[in-house]
Amino acid sequence: MPELFGHTRARVAARHALITPENHVNSTVPGITGATAAVLINPAMGAGFAQTLVTFQVGGRARFADAALETFGYVLSGELEITLAGRRQHGREGAYFFAPPGHVAELANPSAGTQVMLFQKTYVPLAGVAAPEPVLGDVARVAGQPFLGDPAANLQVLLPEGPAFDFAVNVFAYQPGGHLPFVEVHVMEHGLVMLDGEGVYRLEDDWYPVRRGDVIWMAPYCAQWFVAMGKRPARYLYCKDVNRPVL
């Protein structure tokens, strides 16, 4: 249903944000050609990372090569070729890659309209621990586990959990009526995109109906809670910072 004139579900607050597909405005981003790039979260709003939606035309390309930045990409729709660390993967919906600092990731030969969601941040080294290795994967090959024993909430962990990795990316799936078991308040910052379904997200003292394509930023210690609603399961992809000293 179209939005009412002058109305939006989007909101940018001091410690959280909801950005909906109806609000996207494209930017020009170095390294991305033959595609549009909507920068949905970045430090301009107070975040410690960037989250960008790339929509490719036929012949579009993207190249990520930075000595300090790490890049995670997830194919939301369509298909393309992913090249990373000498390996090439034909990626369809659910394929993903992780390029640590100093590694080159290239995306090429997309079908028209292919969409990739990117999470990018400056890598934080850990003394005595080598940098992480590149990752190519597919969510369909990742086993899920009931979250805290609840079969209505299933968690898939997409990256290794060792100390080399300073952030995690997971997929959370809920059956209709499934929900987080309590309101979370924690140090980890989140970027999130709804993959399927719909529900209600509590962010601090506000409650937001959310659906496929919506993007959420949650600052550290932002109170948060989710319940899946409607007739079908809900899923979201999210990142968080992990494995680093508290000070």
Language-model features: where?
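Short acidic-glycine-tyrosine-enriched beta hairpin
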Residues: F72, G86-P101, E204-P220
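Structured core of small recognition/catalytic domains
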Residues: V157-L247
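Conserved short histidine dyad/triad with adjacent acidic residue
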Residues: T20-P21, T33-V39, A50-A67, L155-P160, ...
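A short, N-terminal "cap"/entry segment at the start of jelly-roll beta-barrel domains
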Residues: M1-G48, S111-F167
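Glycine- and acidic-residue-biased ligand/ion/polar-headgroup-sensing regions
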Residues: V58, A68-A85, V187-D205
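Ligand-binding loop in jelly-roll beta-barrel domains
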Residues: M45, R88, P101-L126, R211-R212, ...
